[in-house]
């Protein structure tokens, strides 16, 4: 009886998260914030321009890998293509494809977001957040639920959140996927754990770039909610 009750509660929680996610898709669009020149930062693939919100600098929708589409579908994430002009980082990137009540999202979804307290001093601790959703739904912003501005301000940290591939696009393996000759294979292409590899790629991006955003690459804490905390 106890196992049945726990199972029912788990199903209800998943349904609740799903309904919340899809209802959030219908929220009216808000005006995008104006970029602030003071937030111009260099990454190893190109400059990004964010905005300031109260006492926090914010960068949204920074690509940490190439879009996993076409020949890169069911492959380990690849380094993003470099750019030269400042990339506008004022809007969350698309969520990864998902759908219990209908398909939403985009395969071009490998983005991360950064909130950095403007407090003076040495490099700040970095908190790396992984969203939940049973590895089948969810995103780094979750319809505005995961806005890291207050967290970064109150705790004087650099908060990073990330999208990663979900469902069968994130965890899937089949011999047919290894038979194509259209793309050179990387070492981890056959793992089937593409969502996990996305998260690892995000952490590698943090190691290379977070010092430009006021963070300490040697002081990174990984945390998450539900599936993101397992």
Across the structure, where does each feature detected by a protein language model lie?
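A generic "alpha-helical surface" signal
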Residues: 193-200
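Non-catalytic, mobile gating and regulatory segments of ester bond hydrolases
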Residues: 20, 143, 217-219, 229
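Non-catalytic accessory segments of hydrolases
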Residues: 7-193
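Alpha/beta-hydrolase fold nucleophile elbow
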Residues: 125, 206, 213-225
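Glycine-rich nucleophile elbow surrounding the catalytic serine of serine-hydrolase chemistry
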Residues: 135-136, 224-230
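Short, solvent-exposed turn/loop segments enriched in Gly/Ser/Thr/Pro and often Arg
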Residues: 165-168, 223-227
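Core alpha-helical elements of the protein kinase catalytic domain
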Residues: 113, 200-208
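Positively charged n-region of N-terminal signal peptides that target proteins for export
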Residues: 1-4
């Amino acid at each position: 009886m106890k196992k049945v009750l726990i199972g029912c509660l788990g199903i209800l929680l998943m349904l609740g998260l799903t309904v919340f996610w899809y209802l959030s898709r219908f929220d009216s669009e808000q005006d995008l914030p104006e970029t602030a020149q003071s937030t111009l930062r260099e990454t190893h693939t190109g400059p990004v321009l964010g905005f300031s919100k109260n006492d926090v600098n914010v960068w949204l929708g920074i690509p940490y890998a190439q879009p996993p589409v076409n020949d890169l579908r069911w492959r380990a994430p690849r380094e993003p293509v470099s750019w030269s002009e400042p990339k506008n980082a004022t809007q969350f990137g698309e969520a990864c494809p998902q759908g219990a009540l209908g398909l939403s999202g985009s395969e071009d979804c490998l983005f991360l977001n950064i909130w950095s307290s403007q407090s003076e001093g040495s490099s700040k601790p970095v908190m790396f957040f992984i969203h939940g959703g049973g590895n089948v739904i969810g995103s780094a912003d979750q319809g505005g639920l995961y806005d890291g501005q207050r967290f970064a301000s109150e705790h004087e940290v650099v908060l990073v959140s990330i999208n990663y591939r979900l469902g069968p696009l994130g965890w899937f393996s089949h011999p047919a996927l290894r038979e194509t000759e259209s793309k050179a294979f990387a070492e981890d292409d056959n793992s089937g754990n593409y969502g996990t590899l996305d998260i690892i790629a995000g952490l590698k991006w943090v190691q290379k770039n977070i010092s430009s955003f006021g963070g300490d690459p040697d002081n990174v804490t990984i945390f998450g909610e539900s599936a993101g905390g397992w």
